[in-house]
Amino acid sequence: DVPARLYKPLNEVSNGAGIIFVHGAGYLQNAHNWWSSYYREYMFHNLLCDLGFTVLDIDYRGSEGYGRDWRTAIYRHMGGWDLNDQLSGRDFLINQLAVDSTKIGIYGGSYGGFITIMALLTHPGKFKSGAALRSVTDWAHYNHEYTSNILNTPVLDSTSFRKSSPIYFAENLEDNLLMLHGVMDDNVQYQDVVRLSPVSYT
């Protein structure tokens, strides 16, 4: 079982489409019984429900609050088990809630944007489209205080960085992908998206 927050539209307004939201940081807990720290997304998801969408917000593996094994499941492979949980969420929408398999999108920011891009590049055809905000595309260029606890360092473990970085899968892009990134971002560098873009469209 994967903990998640589900937003369901009223039957009379349902359009049969689904959206999966991927929270950021890679370690936050977002499926809980109090006000979401993603309050903007919380309000946006309720708006999407009013427009007929079913929205699923998953505390994928790597998220805190579910024990050591859950938290450390992404060691040496970001975009592995954490992404598999999004794919399981997609199956849940289709098999349990009768969401149209051809009308499912995925989106998120920061780590959520990274997972969005990895989903489209490593599992083409599973999602109709994705929106990736301020996304890491090459973990070797990100803050090593963050990545070294998960992927080690590029010098010591280049394999982990390569299989975890979307830029190495860019040529697989088949689906609709929107990437948005502020040029003044001092956490995830804007250059990450710039480097990925021409590779994706050559």
Model-found features: residue ranges?
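Serine-hydrolase catalytic core recognition
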Residues: 1-201
